[in-house]
């Protein structure tokens, strides 16, 4: 596994990363490692027009109050 050194990260950015990592019970290193892995994976995912049409069909009823009432009974 390779190491990466990143210089000139603003203090407020590091503080934010540390706070997020702490909330998740992770070290800064582990949090950044996971985010980089997640970002690398997400970059390979492409969303097509067909994907968006399927999504539109799947969530079409969410704006229907009666359908939502029935779903929660």
From Swiss-Prot:
Which GO terms fall under biological process for this protein? cellular detoxification; regulation of DNA-templated transcription
One Pfam assignment: RHH_1
GO terms of molecular function: toxin sequestering activity
Q: Which UniProt keywords apply?
A: Toxin-antitoxin system
Main function = Antitoxin component of a type II toxin-antitoxin (TA) system. Upon expression in M.smegmatis neutralizes the effect of cognate toxin VapC2. The C-terminal helix of the antitoxin may obstruct the toxin's RNA-binding groove, blocking access to the active sites. Additionally, the C-terminal arginine of the antitoxin may remove Mg(2+) ions from the toxin active sites.
Subunit structure as annotated in this protein's UniProt entry: Forms a homodimer, which binds to a toxin homodimer, which then oligomerizes further to a hetero-octamer. When bound to toxin VapC2 the toxin activity is inhibited; 1 antitoxin may suffice to inhibit toxin.
Name assigned to this protein: Antitoxin VapB2
This protein's species is: Mycobacterium tuberculosis (strain ATCC 25618 / H37Rv)
């Amino acid at each position: 596994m390779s190491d990466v050194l990143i210089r000139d990260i603003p203090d407020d950015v590091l503080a934010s990363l540390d706070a997020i990592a702490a909330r998740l019970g992770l070290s800064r290193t582990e949090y950044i490692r996971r985010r980089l892995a997640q970002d690398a994976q997400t970059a390979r995912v492409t969303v097509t027009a067909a994907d968006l049409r399927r999504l539109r069909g799947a969530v079409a009823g969410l704006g229907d109050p009666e359908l939502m009432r029935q779903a929660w009974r």
